[in-house]
Amino acid sequence: MTSQVFRDFKKSSISTSKIILIMVIPYYLLAELLIYFELMPYIAGIFSPFTELLNLPPETSLAIAAGVFFNLYAAVAFAAPLGMNIYEWTILGLFLGVLHNMLVEVSILKKIGIPVVTSVSYRFLMAFFAVSPLILLPKNFFLSNPDSIFKPLYEIKVKNYENFMSFFTNTFFDSLILSVQIIILVSLVLLMTSFIKNLSFLKKINHQVALTSSILSGLLIGIVYGAGVLLSEAKYMTKKQIYSSCFFLMTAHAIIEDTLLFVYFGANVWVLTLFRLFLAIIVFYLIMTFYQTPVIDKQYH
């Protein structure tokens, strides 16, 4: 089992490292270029009503857009140069923890039977619902030092460059450092998830515990892996079980990797983790309790 774990880890870490480099460096450079040429205020202004709802600076609009449509690596690349405080990183991490990588994940959920409109609208509403306590209550209700900046290294530095070449060289170097830091962080998580994926109860799933296996897989590893379990076991599950599992995972998935990406910049780990888990459990309970499976559809085929 150990050799298989390291083979899986090597394969996944190499592919993930490529994705991180491809996503982080260009987006980080783009974010800094927009700041350098003072274009960020114009672009951010378009999304200012949206960011105002989240109590975030307008400049985070690009990070939100990148995270929603692509992945969290792209979002972090845009947000890293903005010098955000712990409160802002926590809101951004919680919001995007629910609502990210929609282009890929929506299509995966569609294969299981969740309509695109349903998954998109649910995750938008749940993302805003998840952050509402942070927005409506005082900043220090959940966070002890909400206004402190955990990583001052990433404060905006627009006028400290002698010329454009100096700016570009330093920014490219910073993007490489950020990429390496994220790769190290994610690699540690991948090593753990490679071990989890090779556990016997996940490799040889008992059809009677397919619901538990899909939720546990998606919660620890990601919605793609959890959905993969659902796809392979759907014929043994009722539609109620499939729906409850999918809606749970749309609220909380990849709880380790996604959380640590934002905790690295100062986001509160307990808020990011417990808020999503609490909402996911409530949604799961409501579906399992009140969803009525049609008589002709007692088992999903």
Predicted regions, residues:
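Helix-coil boundary and interhelical linker segments in multi-pass alpha-helical membrane proteins
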Residues: Y36, A80-Y87, N140-F141, A267
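Hydrophobic faces of alpha-helical transmembrane segments in multi-pass integral membrane proteins
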Residues: I22, P26, L30, A66, ...
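Alpha-helical membrane segments and immediately flanking helix-loop junctions
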Residues: P57-I114, Q208-F262
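Selected transmembrane alpha-helices and immediately adjacent juxtamembrane segments
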Residues: M1-F50, M126-I205, L274, F278, ...
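Short loop segments and helix-boundary regions at transmembrane helix junctions
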Residues: G113-S121
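Hydrophobic alpha-helical transmembrane segments
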Residues: E32-Y42, S61-A77, V120-F129, V158-M165, ...
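Membrane-interface capping segments at transmembrane-helix boundaries
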Residues: M288-H301
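Extracellular/periplasmic helix-loop-helix junctions in multi-pass membrane proteins
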Residues: F262-L274
